[in-house]
From Swiss-Prot:
It catalyses: dTMP + ATP = dTDP + ADP. GO terms for biological process: dTDP biosynthetic process; dTTP biosynthetic process; dUDP biosynthetic process. Phosphorylation of dTMP to form dTDP in both de novo and salvage pathways of dTTP synthesis. ATP binds at residues 17-24. CDD domains: TMPK. This is Thymidylate kinase. GO terms for cellular component: cytoplasm; cytosol. Coiled coil: none annotated. It comes from Coxiella burnetii (strain RSA 493 / Nine Mile phase I). It is an enzyme of class 2 (transferase). Belongs to the thymidylate kinase family. Its EC number is 2.7.4.9.
Length: 227
């Protein structure tokens, strides 16, 4: 990756949370705001975002007779992430576009760290290699009780390999997400989604407002280290 470039930098928002907490709905609300403000953006997801990363996603989420070990899951997540960063995230930020990502690296700390029990130091090593110091400007952590999220997932029909995990797994994932938010309060905004939708939307609009008002003008240069 290129290092220490002065670029026309867009804003980077990630949407995190366990299954069934409303990430897609929240992302679409933000898209509406960007459309109204005529701010260019791209939408991506993890795992996924490019043809190779989507193929990795299929491997990660498909049921198989062969059990996937936690280390394999983590390494595949970062392989897909490397593709997504190289071919979607960085090019968009360099063009001055905003990036809206349905999950990013925090998901690996929550799912493979909290859920699978992989030591944090291993995830940090991979993150340092693949990301440099790239982080979202804002992370919206959509949060609801695990029972609420899993009930919503059940209503969708067939579950993928990760959605099929049990209650205790998702409790660990949720606890890890909330711990991450406590560690980085400047970046995270925790949005409780087990309430009236209008209240949820208002919280999200309030969270993104500082980025909208501080959005750089076309041609404005912003230094990003580690890219």
């Amino acid at each position: 990756m290129e290092k220490n470039m002065g670029i026309e930098r867009g804003r980077f928002i990630s949407f995190e949370g366990i299954e069934g907490v409303g990430k897609t709905t929240a992302l679409n609300w933000v898209r509406e705001q960007l459309d109204a403000a005529r701010i260019p953006y791209v939408v991506t997801r993890e795992p996924g975002g490019t043809p190779i990363a989507e193929a990795i996603r299929d491997v990660l989420l498909s049921h198989s007779d062969e059990m996937m070990c936690p280390d394999t899951e983590l390494l595949l997540m970062f392989a897909g992430r490397a593709q997504n960063i190289a071919h979607v995230v960085l090019p968009a930020l360099r063009r001055g576009q905003w990036v809206l990502s349905d999950r990013f690296t925090d998901a690996s700390f929550a799912y493979q760290g909290g859920g699978r029990g992989i030591p944090v130091k291993h995830i940090e090593e991979l993150a340092g290699w693949v990301l440099g110091n790239l982080k979202p400007d804002l992370t919206l952590l959509l949060d609801a009780p695990v029972s609420v999220g899993l009930c919503r997932v059940k209503s969708r029909g067939a579950k993928d390999r990760i959605e099929a995990e049990g209650l205790e797994f998702f409790k660990r994932v949720r606890e890890c997400y909330l711990a991450l938010a406590n560690q980085e309060p400047a970046r995270f905004r925790v949005i409780h989604t087990d309430q009236d939708l209008s209240n949820v939307k208002n919280q999200i609009m309030k969270a993104i407002k500082p980025l909208l008002t501080a959005s750089p003008l076309p041609g404005e240069k912003t230094e990003i280290e580690g890219l």
